[in-house]
Amino acid sequence: MIEIRVIGMPAPQGSKSFKGYRNGRGIMIESSKKVKPWREAVKWAAIETKVMMPGNDPVVCEMVFSLPRPKSAPKSVQHPFRKPDLSKLVRSTEDALTEAGVWGDDARVVGFGNTRKVFAGGSEQDSMTVPGAV
């Protein structure tokens, strides 16, 4: 098992905005400005960990995203159930791991184990004290 800890605000990768044409091709940019810093944080955490998974073997991922607890959330609420969308958090993180060279293509991911959102500083296993991901 390989573990990478990333400190930073997890950001979903989702919609792209159309910004016109250049050389006959459509220009699409990421709608969220938070994605780039998150992907950079994941990329550098992976590079510092020196994790590489050469070959073409299938991979099963587990990702636990620690998000800040909103002040309006009652203490009885154990998991973040609003935005950001878990599948979009996974997408941005997978793409960053591909950029970092952890694997050649995130198509190698064949399944997800314990992948979830938790509140930072909570009592959940793998919950970080600050926003980030394990």
Task: Label the model's feature ranges.
Residues M1-V134:
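Acidic, proline/glycine-enriched N-terminal capping motif
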